[in-house]
Amino acid sequence: MKRDQYLQVLRLAALPLAMGALFGTASAQDAATAPTLTPDEKAAAKKIYFERCAGCHGVLRKGATGKNLEPHWTKKLPDGSTQEGGTLKLGQNRLEKIIAYGTEGGMVNFDDILTKDELALMAKYIQTTPDVPPEYSFKETTDSWKVMVPVDQRPKKQMNNFNLKNMFSVTLRDTGEVALIDGDTKEIRSIVKTGYAVHISRLSASGRYVYVIGRDGRLSLIDLWMEKPAVVAEVKVGFDARSVDTSKFKGFEDKYAVAGSYWPPQYVIMDGDTLKPLKVVSTRGMTVDGEYHPEPRVASIVSSQIKPEWVINIKETGQILLVDY
């Protein structure tokens, strides 16, 4: 009897070691089965991900409008239990089908946008560990700043006959341009080269300038008073951006501009008529669950006309910032 009890104790003592070995082997298998990409394949996949996926799934692939696309993730549920998942668990074949045919949750199908080889490549890519992109400092922002036409060399009055109260700035997304269209005559008055995949155009309070931001983080300032409107200044505010607005409170018209980025998660305050960078502010912080988030992206920015403030919306932390300029 004593011998049997002794053997039972040994079996129980060995159980944690066996379980540890089992899970350790599973982790090793996950690492071993993760696809490998050549440098050229990785570069191509990164480009496609930036153009087609990052807007919904996030630069770090932690999920936003779309789901988390990390190889392995864990999530604590309200009842205290832990849920696990990841792209490795889904596997190559299923991932290819999801990317190709979309989901009921709202993701579009990409089988008519990407080739079969590209679908397979993206399924492999999201099973690899995401690279953390570099930061983008105030110095780098300032180094990117260009003034093509200084303020003192710009027109002192409107040099064309456009009705600036009825002018449209229309995004030409794939060519990285905007078309300035006369609302009275419906004529294209000018096509201006701007950043990649223009996301939004904002008119200044005076009606003289148009601020255009592309998804590559390039902000362009267009002067509508010129005989043929053109870019007079530009600056790169980040690697991935969506929003811009200007100061519109009485007495501050056209004085300041602000642009927000998805990556790095921050906003930049600038001189309104030159785009000279004045300040960079990070939006990293805590979510409503008290968890630190490394990628709280700047969504819409709206300028108040009743206070000297911008309303800056931050996605992942759910914060609405009132920034007094």
Regions found by a protein language model. Give the residues of each.
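Beta-strand-rich domains and repeat architectures in extracellular enzymes and scaffolds
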Residues: D143-A205
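Short loop/turn segments that connect beta-strands within beta-propeller blades
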Residues: G183-T185, L224-E227, G272-T274, Y325
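The canonical Cys-X-X-Cys-His
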Residues: A45, Y49-V59, M107, M122, ...
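Repeated scaffold domains used in trafficking and secretory/extracellular systems
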Residues: M148-Q158, A197-L203, F239-F249, V288-S303
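Short coil/turn segments that connect the beta-strands within blades of beta-propeller domains
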Residues: K165-N166, S206-R208, E253-Y256, I306-E309
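A short beta-strand motif characteristic of beta-propeller blades
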Residues: E187-V192, K228-V235, K276-Y292
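Axial heme c-ligation environment in periplasmic c-type cytochrome domains
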Residues: G63-W73, K97-T129
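Gly/Gly-Pro-rich "capping" loops immediately C-terminal to redox-active cysteine motifs
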Residues: P35-K46, G58, K62-A100, R189
